[in-house]
Amino acid sequence: ELGAPANFTPVADVNINPQNPVINNRSFGEDPVRVSDKVIAYASGLESGRVLSVCKHFPGHGDTDVDSHKALPVLPFTRERLDSVELYPFKEAIRAGLSGMMVGHLQVPVIEPLSGLPSSLSRNVVYGLLTEELAFRGLIFTAALAMKGVSGNADLCLQALKAGNDMVLAPRNLKAEVPAVIGAVERGEFSREELDRKCRKVLTYKYALGLSRKPNIQLSGLGTRINTPQTRDLIRRLNLAAITVLNNKEHILPLHADKEMPPMALLEVGDAGETDALAGRLGKYTSLVRFRLRKGMTEAQERVLRDSLS
């Protein structure tokens, strides 16, 4: 109904690095098996509604402390480690027959020995590992080519297609990239047959998703049709199931609006504004006093904060 035939989700990265600046809560967790189960469930739900799922960021962006939007992360692991952690959810997604895969901008020396070459441009990674070894036959996308983890390379679209990707995402200069691909075909550097094969593959998926027919997009009233009472109840139950209570002294939780509550302190760490939604919700149950632990506080300021909370 919305006219979105593909969704660049789910994130299949195993988030085992607490310093990861970009994956963190986008991941389903730190256990490869549990991540795999949720990836397959989420993607299967998308595809049951004729939306192409795209698992990302192959071969795994979970254990990095660099954001590939800003630089090129390195996965310095052995192949055995990659197989048991990073690659595990992707292999399970392939086994489940899911349709799309996005290759991230990552340096993986054990698979691609050329220093500085991102996995998204590496034929060893895209064709050798994903297509040949893991036998993935679905659509292969690059991560956005405007990202700093890859953007320093020349002729990005051509390199990405030659590496084995079927579709390139968000190139910065499409007007220059298209002639580069055409020129490579004319010079025999990139085969016309390979380009045609990619085009037929993309068209096959478009046909399967019903894109050969005129879409019947009805935006009017869409919010009401999507946000049904059943949907809201499902969201509530998912939220409840996702909560882990570490400490519940004197059984203060759950909070009750009809029960008299003592004043509550909310200790916030980091930038202002990030807990405004939580503070607003807590304020409906009791009077709330907010405290903030800021970076660079003096010992005297920290002492005042401790005294206020004690």
Predicted region positions:
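Conserved acidic functional residues
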Residues: 13, 143-146, 266
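Flexible glycine/proline-enriched surface loops and loop-helix/loop-strand junctions
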Residues: 23-24, 111-112, 222-223
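Catalytic domains of carbohydrate-active enzymes, especially glycoside hydrolases
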Residues: 1-6
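Second-shell residues forming the walls of enzyme active-site clefts
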Residues: 30-194, 201
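Short acidic, glycine/Ser/Thr-rich loop/turn "cap" segments at secondary-structure junctions
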Residues: 21-29
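Short, conserved phosphate-binding/catalytic loop or strand-edge motifs used
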Residues: 12-22
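Preference for extracellular/luminal or secreted protein segments
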Residues: 132, 153-310
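Structural motif
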Residues: 9-11, 56
